[in-house]
Amino acid sequence: MKVLVLFSVLFLTLFSYSSTEAIDEFDSDAEDDMLSLMANEQVRAKACTPRLHDCSHDRHSCCRGELFKDVCYCFYPEGEDITEVCSCQQPKSHKYIEKVVDKAKTVVG
């Protein structure tokens, strides 16, 4: 029984050592691949639409505020049922949350 326990401990030790060697080799290869991909990366961010500007061309292009992204709201002007007007606006709940965070920052320091 003691011999069986001794061999199982020896086997587990060798197995864990061999698996860590394989993981280390895999990590170094993955790091090299990641570095080569990052070197070839190009910036492809498109320009965002500022607050209160027309966003009808792309409703997901509104810029970010201090904490949250602005939302594209679409509506029909009073008296017109045909033309839809869209603009990037900050929701009131986000405005209130940003005010609370600003007040907390000034109080805390």
UniProtKB/Swiss-Prot annotation:
One Pfam family from the record: Toxin_35
InterPro entries: Spider_toxin_CSTX_knottin, Spider_toxin_CSTX_Knottin_CS
Compartments (UniProt record): Secreted
Keyword DNA repair: no
Keyword field contains Isomerase: no
Annotated region described as Knottin domain, given as residue ranges: 45-88
Function: Enhances the high-affinity desensitization of human P2RX3 purinoceptors.
GO MF entries: calcium channel regulator activity; toxin activity
Leader sequence segment: 1-22
Major subcellular location class: secreted
Propeptide: 23-44
Tissue and organ expression note: Expressed by the venom gland.
Gene Ontology, cellular component aspect: extracellular region
Annotated keywords: Calcium channel impairing toxin, Disulfide bond, Ion channel impairing toxin, Knottin, Secreted, Signal, Toxin
Cysteines engaged in disulfide bonds, as pairs: 48-63, 55-72, 62-88, 74-86
Domain notes: The toxin is composed of 2 domains: a highly rigid N-terminal inhibitor cystine knot (knottin) domain and a rather flexible C-terminal linear cationic cytotoxin domain that forms amphiphilic alpha-helices.
Entry similarity comment: Belongs to the neurotoxin 19 (CSTX) family. 05 (U4-Lctx) subfamily.
Protein name: U4-lycotoxin-Ls1c
Region of interest: Linear cationic cytotoxin domain: 89-108
